[in-house]
C-alpha cells in the first residue's frame, strides 16, 4: 500500500511498540494517525512528541478493544490499521481469563471492525512466542509451534483467526512475529519488567546482575525502533496472508547480554548465577530474518550495542525527569 495521504489507526498506539510505530509513520507523508488505546499499559507520555504533530490525535471516546461499537467508530474512514493491543506474557500467565478476553476476543473484534469498515489493510502483531523453544536455529517462519504458555496460545489463536477472516471475508492482513523487544519507553518498574531492566536495576544499585541458570540461554534481541520500522514496511508491502519474523537474526546469550550491559554502564561487578527457575518459559529463540527482508523489505537497522545504549540513555533521562516532577510537587520518596 502506498501510505501517502492515507489515514491509519494504531490500536495500542500508546504502548512500547505502538508509540514508536506512530513516530515512524509520521516520517512519511500520511494524512492522519488515530491512536486507539485504553492506557492500561500505554501512557500519554509515550506520545508527547507525536501529539505535537497536527496529523495525530487520540480517539476521543473509549479506547478498549472490547468496546466493539466504539472500535468500529474509530475505524471509520481508515485505510490501514495496526493491531498492537495485548496483555503481555507474564500478565497472561497470571490472568489467563483476561488474556483470553483481550488477546483473543479483542483481536476478533479488531478483525470484525476492519471488515465492517472496509479497512484496506491490517498489520497484526503476533509474537515469536508461538514457536516456544527452538527446535532448530535460526527459526524460519515454518518452524513448528512449540509454545507452552498462554500468551503464545493467544497469539497462535490470533494468527489462525486472521487466516480464516482472510479466506472468508477477504481481510487483507499481514502478521509479524517479534523476537525479544527492548528499547526506550519500556517499563522499568513494577511486576512485569523484562530481563534487561532487571539487570540494569541491579547495576544501578551497585549489585551484580543475576542470571537464572548458567547464562547459556540465547535470544534474538531486537530494538523497538526496528519493530516500528517493520510494522510500516509491512503496511507498505504487497504481502498478504503471511507471517514474518521481526528480529536481527543474531544470537545473544544472557551471559553475553549481562557482559554488554556491565561494559556500557561502566560497572566492573561480576555476574552472579542462581539456580534456574522451573518457571523459565523459553531457553533458546533466535529467528531467521531472511523472509522479512525478501518479502516486506525489512532489515534490522540497530545493532545490540547501539540499541542498549539508547535504552540506557533514555532510562537515565526518564528517571531524572520523573524525580524532578516528584520533587516539584513535594513527593520526595
Question: Language-model segments: which ranges?
Answer:
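Active-site loop immediately N-terminal to the catalytic Tyr-X3-Lys motif
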Residues: 96, 188-189, 238
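Hydrophobic alpha-helix immediately C-terminal to the catalytic Tyr-X-X-X-Lys motif of short-chain
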Residues: 157, 161, 165, 195, ...
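N-terminal Rossmann-like NAD(P)+-binding domain of SDR-like oxidoreductases, especially those catalyzing
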Residues: 1-179, 302, 310, 318-324, ...
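Residue-level signal for the nucleotide or nucleotide-sugar donor/cofactor binding architecture
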Residues: 42, 66, 94, 102-105, ...
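C-terminal substrate-binding subdomain of Rossmann-fold SDR/epimerase-dehydratase oxidoreductases
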Residues: 63, 203-333
